[in-house]
């Protein structure tokens, strides 16, 4: 990609004199009437049906519109504001539904019996059947997004506050939309501003993350924690007394601004009495130990983390982020320079013997947004997967842990988001290698050495995949055969041939024994063994007669399914990594970089060169990601129902060790709710289950047949239309190979995800 304006010599002064260009691009509404205005060929309009597919494929490929990094950067930056606006509108809709159509107040008053609902179906031709009795004289659709639990954690106590949030979110959306227009048309940043990476890190880490976390800690301290303390006392039947009046119900709750009054707040947390500033600056920080705690474990009333622990966490994290954000050299000439760090960083001479170390890596990252995006997607995707585990192991929101459909939904959601982001990381890494990588800059540095060693990397990874696949699947096949032959003693199981996950059990014991041994002297902490998370040999957390979380025992069944996880993860990695390492060239197609990110084959006359583009690796990686994560969420769903929630009689350990057990005791047995949902409030999940299966099956039509079949069929259909003088002016064309695979993958994933959605929700909502 060309870089405009031309690169200048590195500036001595770190601060840019004028970082923006005013009135750079005038607003031109006429473009809205010209689909494909960015491309000469697309702007001519459609001659064949391929035009509409190319329009969709290239609409957001800003690189190809102008081929100018500054213009691309401005478009991406402006699009960020549009994205934020969409998020605020979406949040506003959630707040509005909570304020106008929900049973939020009813749920707050009895969260262990009333189920959350925020949508009432209108009775047109019988749809009112979907309005389930959720308790508290409310009929509606049960929601499983966790927003009620989250709002309770924020300290929201009535629908009026939700309506205020809905209006506020709409206003923020309007500001964001204006920001996107302003920073593209009126005050567009220059390329040097985008490439000023140290200032960007300072702004993002210290400003957005650090100050944002401290600001949220302030909300938690002054609103969230006092509200939680009052409401927890109500739910426990031991109301607190404020100014001589017992706070016995939500109607008695002080308004949020009243909680900021030290005279009221100090009756809940004495540390919030009027001397907080003095205590802070005299370092008398122990005075804050009643609302900045380190208790560990779960609140026995709500089955969630202590709000005072959460406040402490956000404050500490925010302070660390503010400090970390100031590590980089910006305007004062002190701190780290990323270019100096990378240019001077050479790895271990034995393990990583690249003579030029990381030289050239800074320039690659500073000029390739695809490379940066690849790294960021990989990290945020991994973080999402970590979050999915924390949602059940350390539930952050009140009463979340006993809302089983929501726990399962949040786990599944964050797993799929993480998987999609990681595949996206490989996609953008491949694009970066093709469009932004300059071999002349990378000579004997770490990236060059990895590319030179790619055959060894991929072949070894392929061996690991084969080893994991044959052995882990072989354990299941062995068990199926032994069970069929009536030889349980010869099966791999906790009662037969044991394969205990000794390392995982050791890690559980470390977490259990380490609690309480790493605390500060004099701190107000009460960490007991098992209270880092109850899943690590802790105790059972029960709320309202339901198990929120309990110790999760690991045995042979977990050992076996975890090696299936290892297998699917390694195969996904093999596909994605091969797509990146062989994006520019391969023995089969040495000039692959000239063909671009996505291409069907290496031209006519070269058989066997189809489906080798970097895009095709992303396509294949999506399937393995989806199938791998399906095993993960199935494992989680069955394990929790069996060993934690007590819904399936603890059958996981003995049933999940055979393929037949997964088919019979998980898929078949647990689909009874969705298959028999007709005539019940969960009947829409039955329809969704059928419909999503259809969408999934529809995808196979695109994936299993070639382009020529359809083009041949179209020729006959067009001939018939010509006979009747009904031929269309836009010539029908079969989808290209790449387009067909894209449509197939989209329907495969959509159908599979919606099928699983219906299966999980009907199961746990149906069980009540």
From Swiss-Prot:
Chief location category: membrane
GO cellular component term of the entry, any: plasma membrane-derived thylakoid membrane
EC number: 1.97.1.12
Keywords: 4Fe-4S, Chlorophyll, Chromophore, Electron transport, Iron, Iron-sulfur, Magnesium, Membrane, Metal-binding, Oxidoreductase, Photosynthesis, Photosystem I, Thylakoid, Transmembrane, Transmembrane helix, Transport
An annotated GO BP: photosynthesis
EC supergroup of this enzyme: oxidoreductase
Family: Belongs to the PsaA/PsaB family.
Cofactor remark: PSI electron transfer chain: 5 divinyl chlorophyll a, 1 divinyl chlorophyll a', 2 phylloquinones and 3 4Fe-4S clusters. PSI core antenna: 90 divinyl chlorophyll a, 22 carotenoids, 3 phospholipids and 1 galactolipid. P700 is a divinyl chlorophyll a/divinyl chlorophyll a' dimer, A0 is one or more divinyl chlorophyll a, A1 is one or both phylloquinones and FX is a shared 4Fe-4S iron-sulfur center.
Subunit relationships: The PsaA/B heterodimer binds the P700 divinyl chlorophyll special pair and subsequent electron acceptors. PSI consists of a core antenna complex that captures photons, and an electron transfer chain that converts photonic excitation into a charge separation. The cyanobacterial PSI reaction center is composed of one copy each of PsaA,B,C,D,E,F,I,J,K,L,M and X, and forms trimeric complexes.
Protein name listed in UniProt: Photosystem I P700 chlorophyll a apoprotein A1
Protein localization: Cellular thylakoid membrane
Catalytic reactions on record: reduced [plastocyanin] + hnu + oxidized [2Fe-2S]-[ferredoxin] = oxidized [plastocyanin] + reduced [2Fe-2S]-[ferredoxin]
Function: PsaA and PsaB bind P700, the primary electron donor of photosystem I (PSI), as well as the electron acceptors A0, A1 and FX. PSI is a plastocyanin/cytochrome c6-ferredoxin oxidoreductase, converting photonic excitation into a charge separation, which transfers an electron from the donor P700 chlorophyll pair to the spectroscopically characterized acceptors A0, A1, FX, FA and FB in turn. Oxidized P700 is reduced on the lumenal side of the thylakoid membrane by plastocyanin or cytochrome c6.
Residue positions binding [4Fe-4S] cluster: 601, 610
Residues that bind divinyl chlorophyll a: 701, 709
Regions crossing the membrane: 76-99, 162-185, 201-225, 310-328, 369-392, 408-434, 456-478, 559-577, 617-638, 682-704, 742-762
NCBIfam families the record matches: psaA (TIGR01335)
GO molecular function: 4 iron, 4 sulfur cluster binding; chlorophyll binding; electron transfer activity; magnesium ion binding; oxidoreductase activity
Residues the record lists as binding phylloquinone: 710
HAMAP family per record: PSI_PsaA (MF_00458)
Listed SUPFAM superfamilies: Photosystem I subunits PsaA/PsaB (SSF81558)
Intrachain disulfide bonds: none
Membrane topology of this protein: Multi-pass membrane protein
Pfam families assigned: PsaA_PsaB
């Amino acid at each position: 990609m060309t870089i405009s304006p031309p690169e200048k010599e590195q500036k001595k002064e770190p601060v840019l004199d004028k970082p923006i260009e005013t009135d750079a691009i005038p607003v031109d509404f006429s473009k809205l009437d010209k689909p494909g205005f960015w491309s000469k060929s697309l702007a001519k309009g459609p001659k064949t049906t391929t035009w509409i597919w190319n329009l969709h494929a290239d609409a957001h490929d800003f690189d190809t519109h102008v081929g100018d990094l500054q213009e691309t950067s401005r478009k991406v930056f402006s699009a960020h504001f549009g994205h934020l606006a969409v998020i605020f509108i979406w949040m506003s809709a959630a707040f509005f539904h909570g304020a106008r159509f929900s049973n939020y107040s009813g749920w707050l008053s009895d969260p262990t019996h009333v189920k959350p609902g925020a949508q009432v179906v209108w009775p047109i031709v019988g749809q009112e059947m979907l309005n389930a009795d959720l308790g508290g004289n409310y009929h509606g659709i049960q929601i499983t997004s966790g927003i009620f639990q989250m709002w309770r954690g924020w300290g929201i106590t009535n629908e009026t506050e939700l309506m205020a949030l809905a209006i506020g979110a709409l206003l923020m959306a309007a500001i964001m939309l204006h920001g996107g227009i302003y920073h593209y048309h009126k005050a567009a940043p220059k390329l040097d501003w985008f490439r000023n990476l140290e200032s960007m890190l300072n702004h993002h880490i210290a400003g957005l993350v650090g100050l944002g976390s401290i600001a949220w800690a302030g909300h938690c301290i002054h609103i969230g924690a006092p509200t939680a303390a009052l409401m927890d006392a109500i739910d426990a039947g031991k109301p607190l007394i404020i100014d001589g009046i017992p706070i016995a119900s939500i109607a008695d709750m002080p308004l949020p601004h009243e909680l900021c009054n030290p005279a009221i707040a100090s009756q809940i947390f004495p540390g919030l009495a009027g001397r907080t500033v003095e205590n802070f600056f005299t370092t008398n920080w122990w005075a804050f130990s009643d609302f900045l705690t380190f208790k560990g474990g779960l609140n026995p009333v709500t089955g969630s983390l202590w709000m005072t622990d959460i406040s402490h966490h956000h404050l500490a994290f925010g302070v660390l982020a503010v400090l970390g954000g100031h590590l980089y050299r910006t305007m004062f000439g002190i701190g780290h320079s990323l270019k100096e760090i990378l240019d001077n960083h050479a790895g271990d001479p034995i393990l990583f013997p690249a003579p030029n170390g990381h030289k050239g890596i800074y320039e690659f990252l500073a000029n390739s947004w695809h490379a940066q995006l690849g790294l960021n997607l990989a990290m945020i995707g991994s973080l999402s997967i970590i979050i999915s585990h924390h949602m059940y192991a350390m539930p952050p929101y009140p009463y979340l842990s006993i809302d089983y459909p929501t726990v399962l939904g949040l786990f599944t959601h964050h797993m799929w988001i993480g998987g999609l982001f990681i595949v996206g990381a490989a996609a953008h890494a491949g694009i970066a290698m093709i469009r932004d990588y300059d071999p002349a800059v990378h000579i004997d540095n770490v990236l060059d050495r990895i590319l030179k060693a790619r055959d060894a990397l991929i072949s070894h990874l392929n061996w690991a995949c084969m080893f994991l696949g044959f052995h882990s699947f072989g354990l299941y096949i062995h068990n199926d055969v032994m069970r069929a032959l009536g030889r349980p003693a010869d099966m791999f199981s906790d009662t037969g041939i044991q394969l205990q996950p000794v390392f995982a059990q050791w890690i559980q014991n470390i977490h259990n024994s380490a609690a309480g041994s790493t605390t500060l002297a004099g701190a107000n902490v009460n960490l007991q063994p098992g209270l880092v998370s109850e899943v690590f040999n802790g105790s059972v957390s029960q709320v309202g007669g339901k198990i929120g979380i309990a110790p999760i025992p690991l045995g042979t069944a977990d050992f076996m399914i975890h090696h299936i996880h290892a297998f699917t993860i390694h195969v996904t990695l093999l596909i994605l990594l091969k797509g990146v390492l062989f994006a520019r060239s391969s023995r089969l197609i040495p000039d692959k970089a000239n063909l671009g990110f996505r291409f069907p084959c290496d031209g006519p006359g070269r058989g066997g060169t189809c489906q080798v583009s970097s895009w095709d690796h992303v396509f294949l990686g999506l399937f393995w990601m989806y199938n791998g994560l399906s095993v993960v969420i199935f494992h989680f769903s069955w394990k929790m129902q069996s060993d934690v929630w007590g819904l399936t009689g603890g059958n996981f350990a003995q049933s999940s060790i055979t393929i037949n057990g997964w088919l019979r005791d998980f898929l078949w047995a647990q689909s009874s709710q969705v298959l028999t949902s007709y005539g019940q409030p969960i009947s829409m999940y039955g329809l969704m289950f059928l419909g999503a299966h259809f969408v999934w099956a529809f995808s196979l039509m695109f994936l299993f047949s070639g382009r020529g079949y359809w083009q041949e069929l179209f020729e006959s259909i067009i001939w018939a239309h010509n006979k009747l003088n009904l031929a269309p002016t836009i010539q029908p064309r079969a989808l290209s190979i790449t387009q067909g695979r894209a449509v197939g993958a989209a329907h495969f994933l959509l159908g599979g995800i919606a099928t699983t959605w219906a299966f999980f929700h009907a199961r746990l909502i149906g069980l009540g």
